[in-house]
Amino acid sequence: MDKQTAADRVAALRTELERHNRLYYAEDRPEITDAEYDLLFRELVDLETRFPDLAAPDSPTQRVGGAPLDKFEQVTHRIPMLSLENAFTDVEIADFDDRVKRFLGLHGDVEIDYVCEPKMDGLAVELVYERGILTVGSTRGDGVVGENVTHNLKTVRGIPLRLRCEQPPELLEVRGEVYLPLAAFQRLNAQREEEGEPPFANPRNAAAGSIRQLDSRITARRPLAIFCYAPGEVRGASFAAQTEFLDRIGEWGLPVNPLIRPVKGVAEILAYYREMTERRDSLPYEIDGVVVKVDSFALQRELGEKSRSPRWAVAVKFPPRQAVTVVEDIVPSVGRTGVITPTANLRPVEVSGVTVSRATLHNWEEMERKDIRIGDTVVIERAGDVIPAVVKVLTEKRSGSERPLPIPAVCPECGSEVVKIPDEVAVRCMGLSCPAQIRESIIHFASRDAMDMEGLGEKYIEQLLRLGLVKNVADLYTLTKDQFMQFDRMGDKLAENLLNAIEASKQRELSRFIFALGIRHVGEHTAKLLAGAFGSIENLERATEEELLSIREVGPQVARSIITFFRNEGNRETIRRMFKAGVRPTAEEKKVGGRFTGKTFVFTGALTRFSRPEAQKMVEKEGGHAAGSVSKKTDYVVAGAEAGSKLDKARQLGVRVLTEDEFLAMLEEG
């Protein structure tokens, strides 16, 4: 492909990708699948890699994040980002309307045109577009000076890097709120707790923490979103009203909340507020009130500002979702991954119409940091569907009888050893037979990527547990047809199929068996390395930390986790029972003289032609090694869409980068 053809294709791809970004993030009506989007994105990445001088700061490929910064630069807002005055009652809303009319010299019976907007609970930012190109993004800061977070805001998919208009304004400053959807917030916190990191207290903190990351690659991995709601300085365009401004920027590709609505007078403001109060808990994001603005920009200018807030707007806040109560007890509970979490049993109290009697304390480090004790008077907060949490302790109410709960020495469910992993906040039960972990461990053990017990899914595993037929994974190999026939709507043929699937799993590869055990930090890739290095589960069980660390890609954290797992007598007994039942993991054979013998591959980004596990199997089948990180010893990096730090490192080290098509071509060359 010559350079001109490439340039034309790059321009077409950028236009198409930005169009699909707008349809997906701003208009919520995608036209293509994620896989189709990734295919277009990968093509653009490939062309920009082959023709580096075609790269541009407004390309969709710039959203993946770059090298970390040392610090944030300061940005002075051309027009200050003022805070809003608050209102909490119907009377205060009516007072606001009266003040507006008095200042404008209007009669009391005149109804003002207002705009009502959900008040997003996120991080306020300003986007600066110069001739349609996003050049600067900053936080609100103190309203006058904020921080330059352009590199992070460029990773937010909903923010267009170029406005979708033929004649963009010379300058357009847009204010908006970056937020983290509730579902994404819950996934992020679950992941952080699984990795031993402290959870975020609420979605607002998560959004703010993500945008204020010095490493934009971390920001890029978090599904942040934005709604834009106000202009800053504008040159080369004019708007008569807030409604016109929102319509226009929406046409230009900037996300605008579809719940924003023009209203007339106090009665319609109150109706909108009550509607948002009722809808609050069903929204996919956090809001903490309603913002009311005079629609006309001419009237806004006439009304002007006070020292800290505009006269033409007010924030109507929802009732607080906090309450004061007493911690009657602190109970350790075991999660599905073995993490032991302290949970506060509270004196029942009503918060936002819901009676709350329990609250998460997250982990012992967090509990100790807040100094939460049994008997304490505390402030709790409830946010949407998120489990209530203790915000702070009212230490002035202590009597001296309050007592802390120490980390338990053994698991409260099974009595197994409790381990506090160094450099983690999580406290974990290491017992494979722990009742609180059994369900998830059995589902994982039987899954397709582990022992592949075809047909034995969650529904049947739950029935096995309910009937008391299994207590850990070893019990699967003792099941009989008569026991399966106790299930609801179970026939002879289906029972036989399930038994056959369990029987067939006895001969799975050693790497699958190691992965199926659910050892912390040991995924499929590490399981293959361990199987290749030790050849049997007995050898792995006897391995020392030094022997484990000698394996490429096995670090201290993984080594400690493996040793801790096999030190547990319950885990060793479970394995012995499986072997006694006939489980015989088989050693894997590598192809000698294959196409990739002696070659190391790393796969990164979103692959569209095959999954990452499938690609790794292709490499290993041909005698190669599929690694998880890039080093000087890496021969090839296969890059899919949104490839990040691994692709950057490959380029720095001069490692050859392949597209998926180029990888498949190598595989077929023979």
UniProtKB/Swiss-Prot annotation:
Residues at the active site: 119
Gene3D superfamilies: 5' to 3' exonuclease, C-terminal subdomain, 6.20.10.30, BRCT domain, DNA ligase/mRNA capping enzyme, Helix hairpin bin, Nucleic acid-binding proteins
Domain annotation BRCT: ranges: 591-670
EC number: 6.5.1.2
GO BP annotation list: DNA repair; DNA replication
Source organism, top-level taxon: Bacteria
Residues binding Zn(2+), per UniProt: 411, 414, 429, 434
GO terms of molecular function: DNA binding; DNA ligase (NAD+) activity; metal ion binding
Enzyme class: ligase
UniProt catalytic activity: NAD(+) + (deoxyribonucleotide)n-3'-hydroxyl + 5'-phospho-(deoxyribonucleotide)m = (deoxyribonucleotide)n+m + AMP + beta-nicotinamide D-nucleotide
GO cellular component terms attached to this protein's record: cytosol
Keywords: DNA damage, DNA repair, DNA replication, Ligase, Magnesium, Manganese, Metal-binding, NAD, Zinc
PANTHER family according to UniProt: CHROMOSOME TRANSMISSION FIDELITY FACTOR 18, DNA LIGASE
Family: Belongs to the NAD-dependent DNA ligase family. LigA subfamily.
HAMAP family, alphabetized: DNA_ligase_A
Function comment: DNA ligase that catalyzes the formation of phosphodiester linkages between 5'-phosphoryl and 3'-hydroxyl groups in double-stranded DNA using NAD as a coenzyme and as the energy source for the reaction. It is essential for DNA replication and repair of damaged DNA.
UniProt-recorded name of the protein: DNA ligase
Organism: Geobacter sulfurreducens (strain ATCC 51573 / DSM 12127 / PCA)
